[in-house]
Amino acid sequence: MKNHLLFWGVLAVFIKAVHVKAQEDERIVLVDNKCKCARITSRIIRSSEDPNEDIVERNIRIIVPLNNRENISDPTSPLRTRFVYHLSDLCKKCDPTEVELDNQIVTATQSNICDEDSATETCYTYDRNKCYTAVVPLVYGGETKMVETALTPDACYPD
């Protein structure tokens, strides 16, 4: 009897896991900003009030990196206590895209708030694709030298 109950319990957990995974797969990733530790997904669901109507559901996940420094490249800088997230800045896509319009190919961006000055954004964690360095003291043979070291070696030293 115990084996029978255990089998049905394991089967129920497996079916629930498959159902949750299927729901995650139908989400569309709108933003995955590793620099700001933010991810925004979207999916279309049926309205519980009107079955003929669909609703767009947004899921905004922000991971606040505690114990991070104001300047992530400087381990002596003070701890960051203020995190600012602007949804419009997270969602803007300023990369130019080629679009065909009236049999002509036009270069356009998907956002109308692109500005060259706003290109430098504050990162709350390391962007693994960007090279970060810091100057650290190195003691070798009784001599102390200040050397530059890579904080993200994979991005700083190509294969």
Curated annotation (Swiss-Prot):
It is found in: Secreted. It comes from the Eukaryota. The gene is JCHAIN. Serves to link two monomer units of either IgM or IgA. In the case of IgM, the J chain-joined dimer is a nucleating unit for the IgM pentamer, and in the case of IgA it induces dimers and/or larger polymers. It also helps to bind these immunoglobulins to secretory component. This is Immunoglobulin J chain. It comes from Homo sapiens (Human). The modification Pyrrolidone carboxylic acid is found at residue 23. One of its GO terms (biological process) is antibacterial humoral response. Part of the secretory IgA (sIgA) complex that consists of two, four or five IgA monomers, and two additional non-Ig polypeptides, namely the JCHAIN and the secretory component (the proteolytic product of PIGR). Part of the secretory IgM (sIgM) complex that consists of five IgM monomers, and two additional non-Ig polypeptides, namely the JCHAIN and the secretory component (the proteolytic product of PIGR). JCHAIN-containing IgM interacts (via CH4 domain) with FCRM (via Ig-like domain). Keywords: Disulfide bond, Glycoprotein, Pyrrolidone carboxylic acid, Secreted, Signal. One of its GO terms (cellular component) is secretory dimeric IgA immunoglobulin complex. Its main location: secreted.
